[in-house]
Amino acid sequence: MKVIYLDKLSKIEDEITLAIGNFDGVHLGHQKLLEIVKSYQDTKHAVLTFDPHPRKFFLGDKHKTLFTIKGKISLFEDKGFDYLFIGTFNKEFASLSVDEFVAVLKQLNVKRLVVGKDFRFGFKASGNINDLMKHFEVVVPDTLKSKEAERISTTLIKKYIEEGNIKKANEILGYDYHVLGVVEH
């Protein structure tokens, strides 16, 4: 898998099907997006994520993430993606207009995008799926729900973890929650 930071990007020659998102925790909803990307055989398979997480950029240390960028890289590599694009989320990136963000996607040679129903982009989240549909084929899967009919989200997973309800967190993660770290003694 090629890992490419957008600020070091040159034009991609391969046509790609691209999932875009923060993918913090890579829960069942994220996994559905990734499966859809992998189902297309007419393109290379790619993911665009952000580092730091946009909420961490805006909120600072108040925003906690489930995955580090290293964890995401490892996961997408294990899933057999051809490309992982990383947008360094800083003041410049946050200021991109809708048209500037679309221009970045065109540099990636995107044939098809796979995004969640509530995907927003561009300065102050001014762009939406309709803006993307003007330029690309866009696939938007149905929102996945938990057994309790709650929308599966990283926020819900964090809530369950904070409550100590790891069993419920695991159900919507689709795997056992774990923490990576160094043990000192």
Q: Which residues does each predicted region cover?
A:
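Nucleotidyltransferase catalytic core that binds NTPs
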Residues: 1-185
